[in-house]
């Protein structure tokens, strides 16, 4: 009882420190926002409040700036406050016998900024900054009076850009010559909320909603030959999640399969192929999960956000990897490796389980450790994989590798990631590290107002592509905000001819990546030869190799490798194989697991090995709770 009370005090103290340090991020200014108390009070019906945080409901006093609704209210003697970002919905239900009283409601800039003073579309180089030798141009502004706000982008076989929109708005197609718009047209494809778009040859794939609000993977063909792509077929429905926490980007893999990243509210497809590599997942946390205090994601079980792999007909689905939160976009580098840019849960700031926004390497069968509420895994859990590059805070949206850009070689190899909240387009520079990568990052494009005393310049980036002209194009928009298309070119003195993708490949780490791929290829079917091949790699110093070897071994019946695991005396190999046994073995195996672990005194182990040993104990007691009291 005292321990629980102390924990609560500690968590509150940590949260308070975080709020103090973060300063204006959580604040709003009364002068810059609109008092909407009367509107919110009028929305209370039958002692219940349901209201959308939307520019259509409230006056938009800060065009182009993301906003939030803040409501202070009282239930009985308790004074409370709730916040919801623009585009969301606030619901407050009061227990029987108590009354809801709205004290104050404010709708205004989410980060406490002043209303828009600078429009990046007018003179981008005056209010935006980029690296030496690069130039930013404004290309096109949306018709905001019609509510068009661009949230995704792709390139068709003719090099035209397709700009996807939100809230019932259509797709815009833009034809460019020398970076100038010569034609922009509205397409009549009956799909909106297009958060994923991809051309494969002359076929357009979309993730979005149809006229009935059903979220699906669509295939659009130009069967009439009139450039309309009006032959629309639903290949797969995405259940559970929709929109911003739904199915997002679609990319074509080196294997000519579609890789589709889904947010944490999408249900795992119920038709997974037997070859599906990500299996046997759970919360697997010793402390009972504390759900989010506002109920966001409460009750949703692992695997969290995931990447699905399907064929070009949307069939033969596999759960390729998981344990992300709400990744919006993914991309393959020139080595054929898949990377994503995952979000945080900003309401967790200050709590021990907070996970910052980060770049991750998605490998076959990988688990990146996201769970809902307080159940998020620390990076050291051996049954997960670590972050590649930790960024900090932000709102991840579109990504692209610089392959094909007319940039210096360093920036052709870079991984470009969009931050919607802080208006940053960052360049991540990845370097091989064993069978994976590590990385550093820098701001490639950002508002000068991020560090200068000036009026805020909204630059809520949504997506990014490399055009056929070698320029980088990015869009801003989302949640009804003003949308624009920008172009970045290199005008410096360094060589900038596009380098073929094959010449951008990394020789460093190639043998380790090849070994990892070989082990991953064994995580498909039962093969009696797999255990003998993979076993030596359980003791590899590379965590990615050990992970792939364990997953390959787990594909085979426990009876084929149980005794080897219990007899293993090399620490890494023992703990990795015993982790597999803890995950998949029968409960009665647990005493033997504990006995094997006792063969490794703590003073003989490295810190990493001690954590691996602890993880085996944790998973074993969680999955066989009746054996150890």
Predicted region positions:
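Extracellular, modular beta-sheet/disulfide-rich ectodomains of secreted and cell-surface proteins
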Residues: 24-113
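Long, ordered, helix-rich scaffold segments
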Residues: 477, 490-629
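Short amphipathic alpha-helical segments with coiled-coil-like heptad repeat character
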Residues: 75-85, 143-152, 336, 407, ...
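N-terminal secretory signal peptides that target proteins for export/translocation
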Residues: 1-9
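Hydrophobic/aromatic-rich, well-ordered segments within soluble, folded domains that form packed cores
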Residues: 62-80, 134-144, 543-555
